[in-house]
Every structure is written in C-alpha cells, then in structure tokens.
Amino acid sequence: MSKVLVLKSSILAGYSQSNQLSDYFVEQWREKHSADEITVRDLAANPIPVLDGELVGALRPSDAPLTTRQQEALALSDELIAELKAHDVIVIAAPMYNFNISTQLKNYFDLVARAGVTFRYTENGPEGLVTGKKAIVITSRGGIHKDGPTDLVTPYLSTFLGFIGITDVKFVFAEGIAYGPEMAAKAQSDAKAAIDSIVAA
C-alpha cells in the first residue's frame, strides 16, 4: 500500500484547472489503487503563514526562547515535514501565476525547507533528506510556456524538489487555457490523458 499526498495551491477553488485535474488524479488513483491512502492538503483554503523576520528564527537552531508565533510556525513546520516524509507519492497542483508558482505553494516550501531536517550541507555539497519519493506536478497555465524561457515553474520545482531529495519528478501540463474554450478543453483532455498514463504505470 502506498500513501499519496496531494497539495493544492490555487486561489480559484473549484474553478481552478489545476484543482480539477488534481481531483481527477485522485479519482483515477483510487480506482486503480483502492487500497492506497490519499491525503489532500489545500494550501489556499488553509494557508501557510508567510516566512518573515520573526518566523525564520524559529526554523534555525538556537537556544533563544521562541515567541508564540515562532512556536506555532515551528510546530506547523514539523507537521508539514512529518506529513511529507510519511507519504510515498507527492502530487503538487501548481498553477502558473505571473510565470511562477503561487504564493501559497511558496509559503509551504519555505516551512518545509529546513537545514538538518529536509536537507543538509556536506563536504560534497547539499544533500536532500526526503528520499524514496515520487512527485507528480500538475501545472496549469493561461498561456503556452512549456520548454520556453517564460516557464519558471518547471525548473524551479525540479530544483527545489531535487534539493530536498525528491528526484523522481513527472510533470503534467495544461496550457493555453486562456486561449478560449476549445483550447482549454484540449488542455484538460491532454492533461487527463497524461494523468491516466502515470496512474496506470
């Protein structure tokens, strides 16, 4: 039995293309892998606090007493990291906003990236500590950016996930959604076909 963690990060709730596709992924996965456990965390519905000058102090080793906000941030960071490490497959619904990921997803990454916990520095360079995972990124875009200089989502997510130890990453693209109903429908159809292929593998 595998454990699947689905991270939603769109601010558009049910209207969101990436949310719809991640819901489709869950439906297909449950159909093919009925014994698996699926956890869904909506980072827009339940937002992660923004990392600021106060909160960053909670995530670094120190003997200084923590404020209430810092204690809450550290507890949430511990919870998010434990959840991430406890799952085998990580599904990230990542819409493109202004060429990059949403603030909601970035805030999550800022609490998950902790030296000595999810990565460490060695004589040979940084080493990721979140290993043995597979990641599937479902990314929706209004325009067409794949393989172009305006796609900052793909290299950023590949780099971040690899940095914490997740190197088996597959991307599902839904592009051109803002080009009209016909293009949006094709983007959804193509993305669902890619999801079907991943689920069946």
Swiss-Prot record:
Top EC class of this enzyme: oxidoreductase
Reaction(s) catalysed by this chain, per the record, are: 2 a quinone + NADH + H(+) = 2 a 1,4-benzosemiquinone + NAD(+); N,N-dimethyl-1,4-phenylenediamine + anthranilate + 2 NAD(+) = 2-(4-dimethylaminophenyl)diazenylbenzoate + 2 NADH + 2 H(+)
What residues bind FMN, as annotated? 10, 16-18, 96-99, 140-143
One Pfam family named in its UniProt record: Flavodoxin_2
- SUPFAM superfamilies named in the record: Flavoproteins
Q: How is the cofactor bound?
A: Binds 1 FMN per subunit.
The leader peptide range reads none
Task: Report the EC code(s) recorded for this entry.
Answer: 1.6.5.-, 1.7.1.17
Cofactor(s) recorded for this entry are:
FMN
Query: Is Ribonucleoprotein one of the keywords?
Result: no
Q: Which UniProt keywords apply?
A: Flavoprotein, FMN, NAD, Oxidoreductase
Under InterPro entries, the record lists: Flavodoxin_fold, Flavoprotein-like_sf, FMN-dep_NADH:Q_OxRdtase_AzoR1, NADH:quinone_OxRdtase_FMN_depd
The protein's GO terms of the molecular function aspect are: electron transfer activity; FMN binding; oxidoreductase activity, acting on NAD(P)H as acceptor; oxidoreductase activity, acting on NAD(P)H, quinone or similar compound as acceptor
* Family per similarity comment: Belongs to the azoreductase type 1 family.
Complex and partners? Homodimer.
Q: What does this protein do?
A: Quinone reductase that provides resistance to thiol-specific stress caused by electrophilic quinones. Also exhibits azoreductase activity. Catalyzes the reductive cleavage of the azo bond in aromatic azo compounds to the corresponding amines.
Q: What is this protein identified as?
A: FMN-dependent NADH:quinone oxidoreductase
Q: Which organism is it from?
A: Escherichia coli O157:H7
User: What is the phylogenetic placement of the source species in the record?
Assistant: Bacteria, Pseudomonadati, Pseudomonadota, Gammaproteobacteria, Enterobacterales
